[in-house]
Regions:
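Active-site pocket-lining segments that scaffold enzyme catalytic pockets across diverse folds
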Residues: 1-4
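Glycine- and acidic-residue-rich phosphate-binding/metal-coordinating active-site segment common to enzymes
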Residues: 8
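Hydrophobic transmembrane alpha-helices
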Residues: 11-132
C-alpha cells in the first residue's frame, strides 16, 4: 500500500526541462572554471618575474581575468528568472568585475612593458580577445 502511494506521488512530480541557455551557461561556466584553474596553476609554477607565454597567455595578458568574467556571465545567464535572458543583479556584478579586472589588466600590461619591453606583449589582448 505504501509503495503504491509513493509510486503515485512520484509519478505526479513534473520535471521541468532545462532551458538551452542554462545548459549553455553551465558549459561556459565549466570551461571558464577549468581554464582559470589552469592559468593559476601555470602562474604559480613560473619562475619569479617571468613573462607567462603558454596556453591562453599566448594571446592574453590576463586570461585568468577573462575566465573570471566568463564565470560571472554564465552565472548571470544560468540564474536568469524565467522568461528573461539574464539576472540583473548578477549582471551588475559582472559589470563591476569587468571594470575592476580591466583596470588591473591594464596595469599588468604596463608592468610587463616596463619589465620585458613593449614587443613582448605587443600582440596580446589585455583581457577580452578582439576587444580589449
Amino acid at each position: 500500500m505504501v509503495g503504491a502511494i509513493l509510486d503515485q506521488r512520484l509519478m505526479s512530480v513534473h520535471v521541468k526541462e532545462i532551458p538551452a541557455k542554462t545548459i549553455g551557461a553551465i558549459l561556459v561556466f565549466l570551461y571558464a572554471w577549468v581554464n582559470q584553474y589552469r592559468c593559476h596553476k601555470y602562474l604559480a609554477g613560473l619562475i619569479k618575474y617571468s613573462l607567462p607565454e603558454k596556453g591562453m597567455f599566448e594571446y592574453l595578458i590576463s586570461p585568468h581575468y577573462t575566465c573570471e568574467c566568463l564565470l560571472y556571465l554564465s552565472m548571470a545567464i544560468a540564474g536568469a528568472p524565467e522568461g528573461t535572458w539574464y539576472n540583473k543583479t548578477l549582471l551588475c556584478g559582472l559589470v563591476f568585475i569587468v571594470t575592476n579586472l580591466g583596470v588591473t589588466a591594464a596595469g599588468t600590461r604596463k608592468w610587463y612593458v616596463e619589465k620585458f619591453g613593449a614587443s613582448a606583449v605587443q600582440k596580446k589582448w589585455n583581457m577580452i580577445p578582439f576587444l580589449y
